[in-house]
Amino acid sequence: MDYITDASYLNNSLLVAGNYSDSPPWPVTPVMTSKWLMDKLNSFGYNSIDTAFFHLQYQDVNNPIIKDKWNDGVGIINYRGWGDANGWHKPYFHKEEITELNPNWKLPIVFSFVCNTGDFGNDLSGDGLDKCFGEELTTGGSINNPKGAAAMIGPSDLDTDTRFNNVLCAVMWDELLEGRIPELAPALHAGKQSLIKEFGDLEVNGTNIVEFYHHVYGVLGDPSLPVWLGEPREMTVNLNKNQSLTSSHISTFVTDETPLMDVVAVLMLNNAVSYTHLTLPTNREV
């Protein structure tokens, strides 16, 4: 395995969206939701937020930005729009485009809020795709030369709807960016739970929306994976090297230019964990 020495790519993001439908009128909220997320990421401190949007005023189906920025390295990729088990239709990025990516250890986490892109059972009937878009993302390349994504979120059903996907997307990102939930699957679960508040017992064509979305949306990859929102910063520990180890306690401060909260400090004695503690919420002392 190769180890990444330059993690600055985690400061970069890519937002892809398509306002499209096979019958008019075209929806407008996929791009609107993505612009909202762009503002959130900008406020959070992302260095680069590239976009590839398809809409009525800009109908460029084959947008090279997707492949170029993916190859350059981005931490997260978010999609809202129109697609199926093959991939994203507008702008166009299918399974075949994944195989054309450069091998790269700078693998993003992909959030694909669009129909069927996570359909891992597409070939269950015997005549579907052997791998859906999400499976191709998470198994692309080889062990030594991977390409695609570290993990992806997507639905396994073809009949998701824009208004529900938007809510799921927005709440997930609120939980991640506001620091309440750092892991992938728990953040997705929070998005699913938000549908209860927004839509209650709503049924569409006899289908309970909340139950449906809880059932079809999932993670392909490690569900406990923390979503790194930017390059990890270097922590500084101010420790008195001459401090007597006969004392009943040892005090130190942990900072990264500003004091850090909830840092786990571990005291080792004879190669064994002797004591652990979190930095205090008041002055970040442990």
Please identify what each model-predicted range represents.
Residues T276-T282:
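Conserved small/polar residues in nucleotide/adenosyl-binding loops
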Residues M1-Y275:
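Cysteine-dependent hydrolase recognition
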